Every structure is written in structure tokens, then in C-alpha cells.
């Protein structure tokens, strides 16, 4: 039983270096932006609170409080290396290996890293090649033709698997390097989530990471599919049959080897298309709540307006009061309070 650790050895070495890089760069990024972020956030919310209290800005004070709490939560992730490592870096790595295992169809104990998934797929192809090589090597002189055919097929399967696994592994290593760089500068983009004008930077950063994860997972799926195809094609080969051509079997495996790299590049491209549509708006609980409230409010309005009957004046009055309060004309609204106090100061 062949259990190669080629990609795990290479990938783990690179992965350890990238982890050190991520921790160092993320820590340096946090130190660089911490003072600016705290001062800018403090000045922004202080100024907004003062302007709302004197009536220069109209709006509910609760919205400012919620925005301030949201900013503090975001800063807790973006400015603390322990929290960032546990909740962001580890989560991204677990997503990567989890998606790769799921898409590759691995059963039993899941792989600890994406490189172990690659080695598992490579091992399946090489186990088929080893089985064919052993059968061919055990042939006697009277079965030299069958033995030579099995040896040829074993080398073909082993070479085809390596041809597929090699570029796939290289692309995955390159993609992991991109993920490491993005995670290193991630605190800056996570902090950008705190303000609406800069939220688009986080969207693009988050979408690029999800794109890379999907590309790695889809590449693992292609490698697993190619191993399954090799296994089925080799199992269908009967070298002792007088009607089956060894040349045809070799050509079939060669055709699969040519088609699979094209499929690999296509799914890599499709992974980029799928990931580019990811946006932070899709995971915003606030936007979900607003959309739900709007749809529910529209349904309730249609129900009550349809059953109001002759109560038109009462409905209009209630609607007027509702819009009057919703527009900020309440005693806790600074602009409204200033207007009311101004009425008493008239001569």
C-alpha cells in the first residue's frame, strides 16, 4: 500500500513559513493602524454624538450607539493578534481543508491539511500502478506479453497521476501563498468594515479569500475524480482477453491525462467566478433584519388597509402620527426639542 507524503512534506514546510509570515505581518499591521484606528473612531463617534445633541444631525441616538458597539466588536478582531489568529486565521484554514475533503469525497478520518488530501489522491493512483506492476512482474515467460502490457500500464497510470497531481499541487501552493498574504494584511480590511464608505475594501478582501478556498477545493475534487476514473478504467482492463487491445487501454488513459488538466484549469477559473460574487452584505444580520421587517411591514399594511372599511379618518390620523414619530419628531429628537423650546422663547 503506497502512502506518499510528498505534498504534505513540501506543503507543511511552506505552510509553517507562511504561518510565521502571517503572524508577523498581521502583528505589524495591527501595531501600525491601532493608534490611528482608535483616534479616528473616537473622534468620529464623539463628533457625531455632539452634532446629534445640538440638533445639527437628525437621527435616532440608538443608531449611533449600535454603530459604536459594532465598531468596537470589529476592532476587537482587527487589533488583537490572539483573537485574530483564533477566529480568522484558523477559521480560514479549517474552511480550506474542510471544503477540500468534502469536494474530494474523502471518507473516514478527514485530512488535517489540504496537502494530505492531495497525497491521498496521489496514493490512490499510485496504488493502482503498484498493483499492475506487481501483476506484470509476476508473469512467467509464457505470459511475457501480458506482463509487458501490465508494466506499461503501471508506468502510464503512475505518470498520469503525477502529471495531474503536480500542477494541481503547484497551483494549490501558490493559492495558499496568496491566502497567507491576504491574512497578513487582513486586520486593515476588517477594520474597514466599521465604516460604510470603506466597507467595499472588506468585500473585495473577503471575496478574494473565499475565491482562493473554492479554487483549492475544486482542484482537489478534480484530482479525486481523476483517481476514480483511473481506478475504474484499470479495473475494466482484462489483459488475458483475446478481444481487448492493450494499445487501446493505453490510449484511453492517455486521453484522460490530456482531458483532466483542461478540466482542472476550467474549475480553477469557475472557482474564481463563484468566489467573486461573495459580499459582506450576504452575511449582514442587520440587512437581513431590515429586509424581513420591510416585507413583514408591507404585508401587515396591506392587511389592515384592506380591512379598515369606513375607518379612513382614524387610519389616516394613525398613519400621520406614525409618520410624524418615524420622521424623528419626538421629544428625544434634538432637532424637534430645539424647535419646541424655540416656540416658548418667542416674544
Curated annotation (Swiss-Prot):
Topology within the bilayer: Multi-pass membrane protein
InterPro entries: Conjugal_tfr_TrbL/VirB6
Cellular localization per UniProt: Cell inner membrane
Major location category of this protein: membrane
Secretion signal span: none
Pfam families: TrbL
GO CC annotation terms, alphabetical: plasma membrane
UniProt keyword Cell membrane, yes or no: yes
Record keywords: Cell inner membrane, Cell membrane, Membrane, Transmembrane, Transmembrane helix, Virulence
Family: Belongs to the TrbL/VirB6 family.
Protein name: Type IV secretion system protein VirB6
Organism of derivation: Brucella melitensis biotype 1 (strain ATCC 23456 / CCUG 17765 / NCTC 10094 / 16M)
